[in-house]
Structure formats: structure tokens, C-alpha cells
Amino acid sequence: MMQVIRCEHPEGLRALHGLAEIEHPSGDTAASLWYDLPTPYHDGWYYILDEEVCAAPPERLGTWFPEWVRPLLRKQGFRFVTLEVPEQALCHVGKYQVVIKRELCVERGEYLQ
């Protein structure tokens, strides 16, 4: 089993629309937060992220959400939940992305602060 983290918002991934480049306060790093819309996370795919793993729809993979992005997203209403994912659920594994099958996830309900 692999532990990953899902980014959630009441409006689904549509809430990410308009978030383009978010710069780190130091100015050293930026994260591109683009997704193909309108593809909500409840369409059979989960959109998972942690410091090195981010899930996106198979037609267009998403980008990395490093730890410093999370407080910025929380201010905009996002929250994060941990999931346990079996290896057979992995459809694609990239350097910063992973695509998994929703029905094979086990939600632990551990929301991060």
C-alpha cells in the first residue's frame, strides 16, 4: 500500500482554475497549478498530491504541489486527506504525478491541518 494525499475543494478542481503560477515567498520556486477543466476529482479519478506525488487525469498530467503550496491553498478553501492506495491501483507513475483508480482507494479520513 502507498500513502498519498488528496487535495479537496467544495467546488472540485474547478477551484484551481485561475491559479497559474504561485511563487514561494523566497521567490526561488514556482508551481504551475494547471488542470484540464472541467474535470472534477469525483469523475472516477482522484487527484492526489504530496511532496513528490500528484495525480491528474490521464489525458493531461498535473504538476507538483510542494509543501509550501499547501498553506496558500488552504486559505482558498482547500483541504487535504490521506489515502491508502494499493499498487495495483496505479495506472501511471511519473516523477511528480500518479494516476490511480478511485474504486481501489481506501480513504482513512485523516485530514491534515
List where the protein language model places each region:
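ADP-ribose/NAD+-binding catalytic cleft of ART/PARP-like enzymes
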Residues: 1-49, 62, 67-74, 81-92
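Active-site-proximal loop/hinge segments that shape catalytic or ion-binding/gating pockets
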Residues: 87, 92-113
